[in-house]
Amino acid sequence: MKRKYRRLFVVIITLSIFAGSVVFVLGKLKNNVSFFYTPTELLSSSLINRPNIRIGGMVVKGTVQKYDDSIVFHITDLKNYIKVVYKGILPPLFSEGSWIVAKGKMVNGKFIASEILAKHDENYMPNKYKTNNL
């Protein structure tokens, strides 16, 4: 009988450790389920104080201002907008009206971006096919 109880004890301990690990991992991943937050989600949550946030939205037309050391623009989710300040080289697909994802943090009501990713639509067509009416 001792062997049977010892085996049962080992199985219970193993399952407990496994279940605890699953709960721990899911708890840590809970805040990282979304690749980015919209301006509305960011402004209406406690995420504003986090150091590394990704926000996504459309670059508002007429708001892009280029300076010697930075670029300032607004992004929107068509409900709210956030002012973004970025120091660095912009991706080639960045333009007014395009969708972007910016990584950074909120400081005094402005989003200070450390990285900009430009999004493109899924309907990519190489130039040689655009001219052939395909």
Curated annotation (Swiss-Prot):
Keywords for this protein = Cell inner membrane, Cell membrane, Cytochrome c-type biogenesis, Heme, Iron, Membrane, Metal-binding, Signal-anchor, Transmembrane, Transmembrane helix
- Coiled-coil spans are none
Which GO MF terms are attached to this record? heme binding; metal ion binding
Domain of life the protein comes from: Bacteria
Membrane topology, Cytoplasmic segments = 1-7
Q: How does it sit in the membrane?
A: Single-pass type II membrane protein
Subcellular location per UniProt equals: Cell inner membrane
InterPro entries for the chain? CcmE, CcmE-like_sf, NA-bd_OB-fold
- The membrane-spanning stretches of this chain are 8-28
A GO CC term assigned to this protein in UniProt: plasma membrane
Q: Which residues bind heme?
A: 120, 124
Which Pfam families does the entry mention? CcmE (PF03100)
The residue ranges for the Periplasmic side of the membrane come to 29-134
Q: In its UniProt record, which GO terms are filed under biological process?
A: cytochrome complex assembly
Which NCBIfam families does this one have? PRK13254.1-1 (NF009727)
Family assignment from sequence similarity? Belongs to the CcmE/CycJ family.
| Biological function | Heme chaperone required for the biogenesis of c-type cytochromes. Transiently binds heme delivered by CcmC and transfers the heme to apo-cytochromes in a process facilitated by CcmF and CcmH.
Protein's UniProt name: Cytochrome c-type biogenesis protein CcmE
* Organism of provenance: Ehrlichia ruminantium (strain Gardel)
Q: What would be the name of the gene that encodes this protein?
A: ccmE
